[in-house]
Curated annotation (Swiss-Prot):
Protein name: HTH-type transcriptional regulator SkgA
Alphabetized SUPFAM superfamilies for the sequence: Antibiotic binding domain of TipA-like multidrug resistance regulators (SSF89082), Putative DNA-binding domain (SSF46955)
Domain HTH merR-type: start-end pairs: 3-72
UniProt KW keywords: Activator, DNA-binding, Transcription, Transcription regulation
DNA-binding region: 6-25
Lineage of source species: Bacteria, Pseudomonadati, Pseudomonadota, Alphaproteobacteria, Caulobacterales
Purpose of the protein: Regulates the induction of katG (catalase-peroxidase) in stationary phase.
One MF term in the entry's GO annotations: DNA binding
Keyword Transcription assigned: yes
Claim: Transcription regulation is one of the keywords in the record: yes
Length: 255
């Protein structure tokens, strides 16, 4: 049976050493053995458990729920894989629709065809947006209701190009911040501060007004508290949610 060190496990899976250490610390993925030299050693069963963790992350399952699912008595790996395949297939179908919308929107912008406005949002999940808004109102009350109304009022006049740029900038910010995380950059370093400056502007555009430092820091707390945000960021890079939140608070302190 093959045995892997934490570095070998990281290279094999694409999961960072830092994330594997974190999974060990919270009990989500303990190494099969720890040598006298302090090295962690993993076997194939650990590989399969890590694969399960990654499948759950792809399905936006919070880490605490992943651990509960994997540690339940009588856990059946084959049954879990079949259920995950069904859910991933449904997601693949939805993403295929989104790709089609992207292609048709690009064709419209480039003048190759005319796209009816009613088709702009095919493939998006209105139920998820409704859940997100309900969570905000439940946890933040009237202030959240006002913020949602302001955001919707500001976005009402957006055209296709506005939406495309807004979404692309969000992805670019997440990508660049995940890269900074993997490089081990401090949250108050110059490169991360530059990313947060872009995020500050992005949030202001979303809210239809510039955020206050307290509101920006509070949004960082929300990212950690809301399971859908957490699932999104952890799927990009393990530890990104906490890093994102800390970077936002560091930036807010400097305003």
């Amino acid at each position: 049976m093959s045995v892997y060190t934490v570095k070998q496990m990281a290279r094999l899976s694409g999961v960072s050493v830092r994330a594997l250490h974190h999974y060990d610390a919270i009990g989500l993925l303990k190494p099969r053995a720890v040598g006298a030299n302090g090295y962690r050693y993993y076997d194939r069963q650990d590989l399969l458990r890590l694969q399960q963790i990654l499948f759950h992350r792809a399905l936006e399952t919070p880490l605490k729920d992943i651990q509960a699912a994997l540690d339940q008595p009588g856990f059946d790996l084959a049954a879990a894989l079949r259920a995950q395949r069904e859910r991933l297939a449904a997601q693949a179908e939805r993403y295929a629709r989104l790709v089609d919308v992207v292609d048709r929107t690009l064709a419209d912008l480039e003048g190759d065809e005319t796209m009816d406005d009613k088709h702009l949002f095919e493939g998006f999940d209105p139920e998820k947006q409704a859940r997100h808004e309900a969570w905000l109102v439940e946890h933040y009350g009237d202030e959240a209701t006002r913020r949602i109304a302001d955001a919707k009022a500001g976005m009402k006049s957006w055209g296709k190009k506005d939406w495309s740029q807004f979404q692309e900038e969000a992805k670019a910010i997440e990508h660049d911040l995940a890269k900074a995380l993997t490089q081990g950059l401090p949250v108050d370093s110059a490169p991360v501060t530059a990313i947060m400056r872009r995020h500050w502007a992005w949030v202001g555009r979303s809210w239809n007004r510039e955020p206050t430092p307290d509101a920006f820091a509070g949004l960082g707390h929300l990212y950690q508290a809301n399971p859908e945000f957490t699932a999104r960021y952890e799927a990009i890079a393990p530890g990104l949610t906490e890093y994102f939140s800390e970077a936002m608070r560091a930036f807010a302190r400097g305003r």
